[in-house]
């Protein structure tokens, strides 16, 4: 015999919890985004995503499974006609939870749960563009390195000594500049 899950239920009883999630899912599919408590939003996410997965399949059997949960036929029609086909090429991740300010009165942590409206094709195109740019950048970089190596090869020993002297002079100036504020503070004391 299957044992019931342990722990608190939303609404107190199993039937009330089912009703709460059915109503939340109906509102989510009807409006696209809803504000609720953070714990209800986290519990609603897998529930709603399974319904969207049924809508993606689009068969009569899947429609009847969704109608067992969502009683509003207009919302079910919207789910199967618009939402399901919209996510046809997306594997999961149909909802997003955004935490908001706590509720006034009881200070309960609140969140917005919404259907993700961005297509994954745009993100894939951006990723492909970045990959192509990163592949083009290393191809251009070795050519620049060869130029630098050629210039370094042409430098004479005298030029190298002059460069070392310039570097030492710059280091001396920065050290003196760093000591200057300390000297001014000592004069003030």
Curated annotation (Swiss-Prot):
Annotated disulfide bonds: none
GO BP of this protein: translation
GO cellular component: cytosolic large ribosomal subunit
Oligomeric and partner information: Part of the 50S ribosomal subunit. Contacts protein L32.
An example Gene Ontology molecular-function term: structural constituent of ribosome
Organism placement in taxonomy: Bacteria, Bacillati, Actinomycetota, Actinomycetes, Mycobacteriales
Species, as recorded: Rhodococcus jostii (strain RHA1)
Keyword line: Ribonucleoprotein, Ribosomal protein
NCBIfam families in UniProt: L17 (TIGR00059)
Family: Belongs to the bacterial ribosomal protein bL17 family.
HAMAP family the record matches: Ribosomal_bL17
Protein's UniProt name: Large ribosomal subunit protein bL17
InterPro entries: Ribosomal_bL17, Ribosomal_bL17_CS, Ribosomal_bL17_sf
């Amino acid at each position: 015999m299957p044992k019931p899950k342990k722990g608190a239920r939303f609404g107190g009883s199993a039937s009330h919890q089912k009703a709460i999630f059915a109503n939340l899912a109906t509102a989510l599919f009807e409006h696209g985004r809803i504000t609720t408590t953070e714990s209800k939003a986290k519990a609603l996410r897998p529930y709603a995503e399974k319904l969207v997965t049924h809508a993606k399949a689009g068969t009569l059997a899947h429609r009847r499974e969704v109608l067992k949960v969502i009683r509003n036929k207009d919302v079910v029609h919207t789910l199967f006609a618009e939402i399901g086909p919209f996510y046809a090429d997306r594997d999961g991740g149909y909802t997003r939870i955004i935490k908001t300010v706590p509720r006034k009165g009881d200070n309960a942590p609140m969140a917005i749960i919404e259907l993700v409206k961005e297509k994954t094709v745009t993100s894939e195109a951006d990723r492909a563009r970045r990959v192509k740019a990163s592949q083009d950048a290393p191809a251009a970089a070795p050519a620049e390195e060869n130029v630098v190596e050629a210039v370094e090869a042409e430098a004479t020993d005298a030029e190298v000594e002059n460069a070392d002297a310039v570097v030492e002079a710059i280091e001396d100036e920065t050290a003196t500049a760093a000591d200057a504020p300390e000297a001014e503070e000592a004069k003030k004391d």
